[in-house]
Amino acid sequence: MTYSEQHLKEASEILTKLDTDAIEGMAALLVRVRADGGRLFFLGVGGSAGNCSHAVNDFRKIVGIEAYAPTDNVSELTARTNDEGWDTVFIEWLKISRLNDKDAVFVFSVGGGNLEKNVSPNLVRALQHAKSVGAAITGVVGRDGGFTATV
């Protein structure tokens, strides 16, 4: 079997394992956010921050949802990290953005956040805040899903 054939075979197997109900639920959530005039805040670190930037572009341009990613503003991100710490960088950004119950937070993360293991504690704290103000939470996470999968 060639490399290409093997890759396509594996990709096909992965596609059959996707949770289509979860995907439909995510789509319905995004439709509601747009209909309610809510905003979409993308959170991610490392390579996932790059995915967030791309998603902001697509959701604003193609879907027509007001969307933002705090990692797109490097000067604010680094100032907050320096002055307030990495653990709270996203929660403080969401607070100043007045995250509310019409909005949604969308996480891209392999680990999904875990305070005990010190995996993306900034995501966990941001999601705790999102939950406290009634914002919807969704995301694309790795197998374990971390804290993101529990909210």
Predicted segments with their positions:
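A short, well-structured juxtamembrane/interface segment
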Residues: 18-36
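Glycine-rich, small/polar surface segments that engage phosphate groups of diverse ligands
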Residues: 32-104
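Surface-exposed amphipathic alpha-helices with a cationic face
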Residues: 60, 127-134
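Short beta-strand/turn micro-motifs composed of small residues
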Residues: 71, 109, 139-142
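Glycine/threonine-rich flexible loop motifs
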Residues: 113-123
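Short, glycine/polar-rich helix-capping loops at beta-to-alpha or helix-loop-helix junctions
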Residues: 139-151
